[in-house]
């Protein structure tokens, strides 16, 4: 194919011709670089770096640089419980109210006796800000800042008069530090004042329960020491320390009060380390000062080049596994913010590749083995009272953060989520017993670093009892991609525990035929049914609607998946056959997907409409995506009803809503619609550095949902068949996708031109039978030897594989 490489060369020559200063111009790779011609004015425009634990947002200012800092375990509060003892005594009455069509009575009783105490969770906090003050001249020009996704480094460059100034900023995983390098092309030109500032929580009811102290440490270091805030009666038990250590090359360096002053250096390297006393959700016994000192000891004596090389090598060991390239156009070489504006009326397919690659970057930067999972904002947060507390919301958002993790060949990055699910079983088993009188474990729609599990916020949100079940499906997905039986044995008790709860919790529908969850809800969306009136909620102190019901469609679909996964796990491991049979019989009695009188898939067991028909969630389409109950192949009779839901709710909404819609339309094989939604997302619900908006607050769920949606457009594997280009937009007539993973333990690389596969390669990691839909006849070869294949349907081939072997697919 006429590769992107040749197009890149063409546009480099074009820009050289039209730009008089071309000798000094940098032409960025459009699929792997976010770049801008001006500094960030707002936090939402800053560029992120992260190593899974330490995050920073870089503004790139030339007069007063701000680098906002986060350490992932700095939260309000401390270990606490939300369990309400004896709440289960009220459950039968609540269930009776719901079955009798008295939702407000059920809502109030649930609010009084089954809601968590305290009713809200804790907040993720900002750790500190680093400010660098420069005395620039009046001739600032040739400014640019960029994030290189191939290295994970943010760059800032500008000229002041005849001097070229450069900065490099990255977050090193090997050295657990944020590194800032300042240099210029002339000697003795680096001068600035630096201040490391703490941040206070000024806006909540426990004002003045947090504190910090700013100090200089010798002549070359600054530090902030502090304590987290109390919140909702939970004592702040996090102690933290952030320390900056400077190394100058030539020039002079000193501290003045809380400032570090550098004069006339050739270059300066700033090393920022941070730590808290957090050990786990129930242990805060570490010494944050010892941890910081240990980080500094380990990095002492290393050169900047060595630190940089180690960080880039580590980062690339994740990022370089996958490559997505789509055709470039002239607009592809615009600054990223201008590309986003131009997309509405111009061709720029590679912007989708950039969005996909940025999603992988965010996963690598916010979720590494041994860290916390990515929260609503990943690991980046400037506010002490952030939107939705920057917590873990599990009625869509946390799950969406990890939809792409396996296919994006970042399986290790799922480890923090898997660990969190295991940890939730601790308090989750208490909630199951005390709130519901059930065995196993349960978790609802919100949690925090302390792994609380009871219903949070209010009954309108908290009655989502399948949040833990949904998270548990991710444990099974990890197995499907890896086929690691040792891992499956490890998580089997977690999967079984979730199933055990619902086997106790499910009750018979009044028709005597179905089993349903009760109470239940369809996340955040009230049904348009009898008794669902606007009312004053005593738990939240708000006028609102109740969502409480029984047997919501999403509940039934999640449990259909969960029960099926458990049955398969028990069979694979040879465990609990009698219990697995009970689960199989219960699964058969779950409410099937139903089509309402308006032609849409019903959101509830009863044929009710929605009070918000443009709602941002698509809960009742879980079975289409990310679930596997509904598909064009298996349930063609439901496809029109699913499309009717998507048409009813439209292509707009929040960032996360649009990411979900992209994947849903991809499962319906309509790539043109998915791409149309992507364009609308870029125009209306993405910040200039491709972070998603949830209305206006920055969140990573939409960023990562879009990443998953793009992957789903190009390859699917949820039905046991590797389906290449299932939802390819007509405009993406050629491209390359390499290193992507699919279920069954396979890694794929393929190229296409004129909307048809031209080349494909498969690595078998587990030695399983490979079934692939490629759309053309082909030959399978390994080491030049032809492999026997069987055509099991039109364009679908099956062949045996050996673990660790590469197979070439030659298209005929």
Each language-model region and where it sits:
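Non-catalytic carbohydrate-binding regions of carbohydrate-active enzymes
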Residues: 477-478, 482, 486-487, 498-508, ...
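Short, surface-exposed recognition loops and adjoining beta-strand edges that mediate ligand/DNA contacts
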Residues: 35, 373-391, 502, 508-525, ...
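Acidic/His metal-coordination segments adjacent to aromatic residues that form catalytic metal sites
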Residues: 378-389, 443-463, 520-550, 684-696
């Amino acid at each position: 194919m006429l590769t992107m490489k040749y197009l890149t060369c063409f546009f480099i020559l074009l820009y050289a011709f039209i730009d008089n200063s071309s000798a000094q111009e940098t032409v960025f790779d459009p699929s792997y670089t976010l770049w801008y011609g001006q500094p960030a004015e707002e936090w939402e425009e800053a560029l992120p770096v992260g190593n899974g634990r330490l995050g920073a947002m870089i503004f790139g200012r030339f007069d007063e640089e701000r680098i906002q800092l986060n350490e992932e375990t700095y939260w309000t509060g401390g270990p606490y419980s939300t369990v309400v003892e004896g709440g289960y005594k009220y459950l039968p009455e609540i269930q009776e109210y719901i079955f009798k069509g008295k939702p407000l009575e059920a809502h109030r009783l649930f609010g009084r006796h089954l809601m968590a105490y305290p009713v809200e969770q804790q907040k993720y906090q900002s750790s500190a800000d680093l400010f660098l003050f420069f005395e620039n001249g009046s001739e600032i020009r040739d400014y640019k800042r960029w994030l290189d996704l191939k290295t994970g480094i943010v760059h800032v460059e500008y000229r002041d008069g005849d001097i070229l100034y450069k900065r490099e900023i990255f977050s090193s995983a090997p050295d657990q530090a944020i590194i800032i390098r300042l240099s210029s092309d002339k000697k003795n030109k680096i001068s600035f004042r630096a201040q490391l500032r703490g941040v206070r929580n000024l806006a909540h009811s426990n004002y003045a329960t947090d504190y910090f102290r700013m100090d200089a440490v010798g002549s070359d270091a600054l530090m902030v020491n502090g304590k987290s805030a109390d919140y909702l009666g939970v004592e702040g038990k996090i102690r933290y320390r952030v320390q900056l250590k400077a190394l100058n090359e030539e020039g002079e360096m000193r501290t003045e009060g809380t400032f570090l002053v550098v004069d006339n250096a050739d270059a300066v390297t700033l090393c920022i380390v941070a730590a808290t006393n957090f050990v786990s959700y129930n242990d805060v016994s570490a010494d944050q000062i010892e941890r910081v000192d240990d980080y500094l000891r380990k990095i002492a004596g290393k050169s900047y080049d060595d630190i940089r090389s180690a960080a880039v090598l580590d980062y690339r060991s994740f990022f370089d596994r996958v490559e997505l390239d789509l055709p470039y156009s002239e607009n592809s070489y615009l600054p990223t913010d201008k590309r986003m504006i131009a997309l509405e009326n111009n061709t720029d397919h590679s912007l989708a590749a950039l969005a996909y690659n940025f999603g992988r970057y965010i996963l690598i930067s916010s979720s590494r083995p041994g860290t916390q999972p990515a929260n609503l904002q990943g690991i980046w947060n400037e506010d002490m009272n952030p939107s939705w507390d920057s917590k873990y919301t599990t009625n869509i958002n946390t799950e969406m953060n990890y939809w792409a993790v396996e296919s994006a060949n970042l399986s290790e990055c799922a480890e923090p989520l898997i660990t969190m699910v295991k940890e939730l079983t601790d308090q989750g088993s208490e909630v199951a017993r005390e709130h519901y009188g059930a065995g196993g474990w349960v978790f609802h729609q919100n949690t925090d670093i302390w792994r609380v599990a009871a219903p949070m916020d209010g009954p309108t949100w908290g009655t989502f009892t399948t949040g833990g079940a949904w998270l548990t499906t991710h444990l099974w997905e990890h197995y499907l991609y890896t086929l690691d039986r040792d891992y499956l044995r490890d998580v089997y008790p977690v999967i079984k525990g979730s199933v055990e709860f619902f086997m106790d919790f499910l009750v018979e529908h009044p028709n005597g035929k179905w089993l349903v969850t009760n109470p239940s809800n369809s996340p955040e969306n009230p049904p348009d049914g009898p008794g669902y009136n606007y009312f004053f909620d005593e738990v939240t102190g708000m006028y609102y609607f109740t969502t409480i019901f029984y047997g919501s469609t999403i509940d039934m679909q999640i449990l259909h998946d969960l029960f099926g996964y458990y049955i398969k796990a028990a069979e694979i491991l040879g465990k609990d056959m009698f219990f697995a049979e009970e689960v199989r019989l219960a699964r058969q009695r779950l409410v099937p997907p139903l089509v309402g009188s308006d032609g849409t898939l019903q959101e509830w067991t009863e044929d009710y409409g929605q009070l918000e028909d443009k709602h941002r969630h698509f809960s009742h389409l879980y079975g289409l995506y990310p679930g596997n109950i509904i598909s064009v192949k298996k349930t063609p009779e439901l496809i029109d009803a699913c499309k009717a839901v998507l048409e009813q709710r439209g292509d707009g909404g929040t960032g996360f809503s649009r990411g979900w819609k992209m994947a849903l339309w991809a499962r319906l094989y309509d790539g043109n619609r998915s791409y149309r939604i992507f364009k609308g997302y870029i125009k209306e619900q993405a910040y200039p550095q491709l972070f998603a908006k949830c209305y206006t607050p920055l969140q990573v769920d939409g960023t990562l949902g879009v990443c998953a949606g793009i992957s789903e457009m190009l390859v699917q594997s949820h039905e046991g068949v590797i389906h290449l280009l299932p939802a390819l937009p007509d405009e993406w007539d050629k491209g390359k996708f390499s290193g992507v993973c699919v279920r069954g333990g396979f890694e794929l690389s393929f190229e296409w031109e004129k909307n048809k596969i031209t080349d494909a390669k498969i690595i078998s990691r587990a030695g399983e039978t490979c079934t692939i839909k490629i759309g053309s006849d082909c030959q399978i070869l390994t080491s030049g030897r032809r492999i026997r294949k069987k055509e099991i349907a039109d364009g679908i081939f099956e062949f045996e594989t050996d673990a660790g072997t590469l197979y070439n697919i030659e298209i005929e």
